[in-house]
């Protein structure tokens, strides 16, 4: 069940959280993800107004805005989530970790795919902005405050404004 996957992932990726009980009661990121999962089911069932109301509830209580039309995979973790914004056509793979202030935003008002697609096992650092219909490959890392407007091949690291790609991820890269 995805709810238990989300708890396990949160425990695995947040060394400050010691128990599932603690995570359950104190993680705004986890709460926002759970409300998103319910709102997304309602969105797919064409209960759009109710899904948007639930999303606004989560935003009010967590400071995290996830559009119910976004598609998010398993074991998704938002750590220190205040200010996170995930747009309507964003797609996020499995085992993704994002930090506070991250935006997965669009750059057009046209009713098309306008938000990023994020692969599996991606880490997105605090304050990073991923803008437009771009693809972030599997096993990538986006550094804190990077602005990414172009596709990232699998296994790369993006840093800076406008982000530049550096060869590949290694153990000694500290991005966040």
Where are these regions (language model features)?
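Left-handed beta-helix
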Residues: 62, 67-68, 73-74, 79-88, ...
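Terminal amphipathic alpha-helical/low-complexity segments used for targeting or macromolecular assembly
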Residues: 1-62, 173-176
């Amino acid at each position: 069940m995805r709810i238990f996957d989300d708890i396990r992932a949160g425990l695995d990726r947040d060394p400050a959280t010691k128990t599932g009980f603690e995570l359950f009661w104190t993680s705004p990121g986890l709460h926002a993800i759970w409300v998103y999962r319910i709102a997304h089911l309602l969105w797919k069932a064409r209960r759009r107004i109710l899904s948007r109301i639930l999303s606004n509830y989560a935003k009010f209580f967590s400071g995290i805005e996830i559009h119910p039309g976004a598609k998010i995979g398993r074991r998704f973790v938002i750590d220190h989530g205040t200010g996170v914004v995930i747009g309507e056509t964003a797609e996020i793979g499995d085992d993704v970790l994002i930090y506070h202030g991250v935006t997965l935003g669009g750059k057009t008002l046209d009713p098309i795919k306008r938000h990023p697609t994020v692969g599996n096992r991606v880490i997105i650092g605090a304050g990073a902005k991923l803008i437009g219909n771009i693809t972030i490959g599997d096993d990538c890392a986006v550094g804190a405050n990077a602005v990414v407007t172009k596709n990232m091949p699998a296994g790369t690291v993006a840093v800076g404004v406008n982000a530049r790609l550096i060869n590949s991820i290694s153990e000694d890269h500290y991005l966040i």
